[in-house]
């Protein structure tokens, strides 16, 4: 394959991807804090970096993909206390729900999915190294903080100086901190907090801060210097900035070569928030839309652009994906076919994906290929369409299953459609063509398209 270019947030430009170890890629993505159901913003992170790791594997790399789970956090403690349950019961339930959502979206499981509570010893070790290196101090309130003024490179990911960051960020006043930007590495235990939320440490009982979790887990599983780190744009500062400060401050090595950030999700051109009443969980969305439609909707936009969620955009995605599946409906595609990168569509798909994972252009190539399949009825082109789409996790189902399946807001199910088709067949046999036409019109109004075939057969699909 040709060289892959990735927009590196740290360098603020596209760069040719060169792995540290030839043929091998180590990547880490910040995962979910599991105290509630995943929302559409989480869906985007899941799908985007699933697409990235799929493409890297398709390019022949040996990929180690790590996506963590934050299962110790102030919000988790608060929710568990409110519910009258243990933290482990709460997080276990929402980890299972997260996996269900990810599986539905066609997201492959990471190679490693570390839980923060399983890596506390590594976090304590890293905090100790930071203290030894003069970058951490225990404050009067018992917390251990990172001294940002002591790390010369602080601000390099966000591209801002300490003065700019202090002016631009709303940092809560804390007399125990040496600098308002200092952040917590180890939180001292509070008397009213549950026993399972505290661990013994050289600084007294407590729990890790959020930022140290990712530094410790990524370094433990991928090494102190690795290739790719991803996450949502909202994590660029302070979370990822703090990860760099922690990891490089502890090891003295470059932490990550390339940083990738996906754009925000907006709802009807507004920021998604519970207070605005436009907050949607993945489960909410999947009650109305087929999961592959949601995945397709996410991949139609470039990962770095903001994604505007709306019913109109999802409806459009459903119609578009239906067009692709329709092209494969009556033309047999070889099962398990591999992409032909020398074929013209394969070349352009390859060029698009190697240009910073440009899925909008790659998807446009799929539509051009679908048009060719419709014209030529070529099994070879149908196989190429299915193979290229499969690389990014699309068009993997039997076309008839997709076209007749999915979620329908009007509640029309397959059995009802088949019954109406039989009723229409009987009307035609009785030469009651007005009745037959009325049934077709009724079904079309309900989003069902009938296609009469030779031999008196009638096939159907959702519009």
Curated annotation (Swiss-Prot):
Binding-site residues for ATP, renumbered to this chain: 274
Keyword ATP-binding among record annotations: yes
Renumbered ranges of motif 'KMSKS' region: 271-275
Binding site for Zn(2+): 30, 214, 239, 243
Catalytic activity: tRNA(Cys) + L-cysteine + ATP = L-cysteinyl-tRNA(Cys) + AMP + diphosphate
Superkingdom to which the source organism belongs: Bacteria
Co-factor(s): Zn(2+)
Listed GO MF terms: ATP binding; cysteine-tRNA ligase activity; zinc ion binding
Protein name per the record: Cysteine--tRNA ligase
Upper lineage: Bacteria, Pseudomonadati, Pseudomonadota, Betaproteobacteria, Burkholderiales
């Amino acid at each position: 394959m040709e060289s892959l270019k990735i927009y590196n947030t740290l360098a603020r430009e596209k760069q040719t991807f060169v792995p540290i170890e030839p043929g091998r890629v180590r990547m880490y993505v910040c995962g979910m804090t599991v105290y509630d159901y995943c929302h559409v913003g989480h869906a985007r992170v899941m799908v985007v970096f699933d697409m990235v790791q799929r493409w890297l594997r398709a390019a022949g790399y040996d990929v180690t993909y790590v996506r963590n789970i934050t299962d110790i956090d102030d919000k988790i403690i608060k929710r568990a206390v409110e519910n009258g349950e243990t933290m482990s019961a709460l997080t276990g339930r929402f980890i299972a729900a997260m996996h269900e959502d990810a599986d539905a979206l066609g997201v492959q499981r990471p190679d490693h999915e570390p839980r923060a509570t399983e890596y506390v010893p590594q976090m304590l070790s890293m905090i100790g190294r930071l203290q030894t290196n003069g970058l951490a101090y225990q404050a009067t309130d018992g917390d251990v903080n990172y001294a940002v003024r002591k790390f010369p490179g602080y601000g390099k990911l966000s591209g801002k100086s300490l003065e700019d960051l202090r002016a631009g960020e709303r940092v809560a006043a804390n007399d125990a901190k040496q600098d308002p930007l200092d952040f917590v590495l180890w939180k001292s235990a509070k008397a009213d907090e549950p026993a399972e939320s505290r661990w013994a440490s050289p600084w007294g009982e407590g729990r890790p801060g959020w930022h140290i979790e990712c530094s410790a887990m990524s370094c433990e599983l991928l090494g102190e210097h690795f290739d790719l780190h991803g996450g949502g744009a909202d994590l660029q500062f302070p979370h990822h900035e703090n990860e760099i400060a922690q990891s490089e401050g502890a090891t003295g090595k470059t932490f990550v070569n390339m940083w990738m950030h996906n754009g925000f999700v907006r709802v009807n051109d507004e920021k998604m928030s519970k207070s605005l009443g436009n907050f949607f969980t993945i489960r909410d969305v999947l009650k109305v839309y087929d999961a592959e439609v949601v995945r397709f909707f996410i991949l139609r936009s470039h990962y770095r652009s903001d994604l505007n969620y709306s019913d109109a955009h999802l409806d459009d995605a459903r119609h578009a994906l239906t067009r692709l599946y329709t092209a494969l409906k009556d033309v047999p595609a070889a099962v398990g076919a591999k992409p032909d990168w020398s074929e013209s569509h394969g070349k352009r798909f390859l060029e698009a994906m190697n240009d910073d994972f440009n899925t909008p252009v790659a998807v446009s190539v799929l539509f051009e290929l679908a048009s060719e399949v419709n014209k030529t009825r070529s099994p070879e082109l149908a196989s190429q369409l299915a193979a290229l789409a499969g690389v990014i996790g699309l068009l993997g189902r039997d076309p008839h299953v997709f076209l007749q399946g999915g979620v329908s807001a009007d509640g029309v199910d397959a059995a009802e459609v088949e019954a109406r088709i039989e009723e229409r067949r009987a009307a035609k046999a009785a030469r009651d063509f007005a009745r037959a036409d009325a049934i077709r019109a009724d079904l079309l109004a309900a989003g069902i398209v009938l296609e009469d075939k030779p031999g008196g057969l009638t096939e159907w699909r959702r519009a």
